[in-house]
Amino acid sequence: MNSNKIQEQIENNRRSVSFDSYDITVRQLFDMIQEGLIDIAPEYQRHFVWDEVRQSQLIESLILGIPVPNLFMATNKDSSWEVIDGLQRLTTIVNFLGDEQLIKKTNANGIKLKLKGLEKLDTLNNSFFEDLPKSVQLMFMTRPVRVTVLNDRSDFELRYDLFERLNTGGVTLHPQEIRNCVYLGKFKDFLQECAENQDFLDVVKMTKNAERTGNREELVLKFFSYYEDRELFVHSVKEFLNDYMAKKTESFPEQTAYKSLFEETFARLKQLLPQGIVRGNRTNITPLVLFEAISIATADIITDENQQILDSQKLQDVLNNAELTKLTTGATNSRNKLTQRINFVKEHLA
């Protein structure tokens, strides 16, 4: 084991972590959520997994002054806080203290918490917050919770890494779901808008679960990143997409042009491929690498100054071409394979 190489690797991978720590009372946290100063990430509603007993145990711990795990936040550019780790605890506090409107705003499936399953404070079972003695209410509201806040001087890559490592809500998050929480701004909103485009939805077939976990937005992200920067792609798709999204979050002057390109690409594909980007008898699912090859090749052709006429029959034929099948199966995550797939489609549409 080479200690110098180990030290060098550590130094090369260290990034500036800039954070602040606070002790904030339950009441202050609740007020900040009400006022929109803490974003519990409504895109993560499906990830609230605690049942009433688990929620009640947190309330019991706070009343008794038993330490609870730190909350971890990231500061946005508008100085609001985004939850990285602590969704379950904060949503529980809202369910216990909030009215129906706030509870539904925070978690569409949320209901007012009635304490149950408590062992140490079993006299509080079947109680809402409003049923507690005033002294117990005050005790609960003034309990401090440690909050660590990653400030906005920390880079996007660090935020992504921390969210991926620290989010322990009990449900594995899709990488795009994490991006939607880390890379906030105009470009993220643009991706979500494109993902609702009806022509895109008609052309790209995916399961309901894939739609719920951010796959649609990731396909849109792949479309633009491979269209613009595929020469920068090496092997790791996740890192490539993260880098591209970070770049566009900082500056996105191409929004109008890219919106037009996206709409024209998928309008043409819907016209040319009425059944969508599908292969053989599997008409209910779009293979991801086939999506990349067909959509990027089509976009390239549309933006080519010597634009050729796209032919429906040629496009249908290329979908089921045996050579393209070889290029879209097996080890496909390399720049060479990506380029080959796209060029193959373009050449066969000529």
Language-model region placement:
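A generic structural signal for well-ordered alpha-helical surface patches
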Residues: 56, 221, 288, 292-296, ...
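Glycine-rich phosphate-binding segment of PLP-dependent enzymes
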Residues: 32-39
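Basic- and aromatic-enriched surface patches that contact anionic nucleotides/nucleic acids
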Residues: 2-24, 28, 41-242, 324-332
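Small-residue-rich helix-loop
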Residues: 235-277, 283, 290
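Short amphipathic alpha-helix initiation/capping segments at coil-to-helix junctions
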Residues: 155, 213, 255-262, 283-291, ...
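Eukaryote-biased recognition of C-terminal alpha-helical segments
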Residues: 318-350
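Short, mixed-charge aromatic SLiMs
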Residues: 187-189, 243-256, 312-331
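C-terminal hydrophobic structural anchor segments
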Residues: 270-323
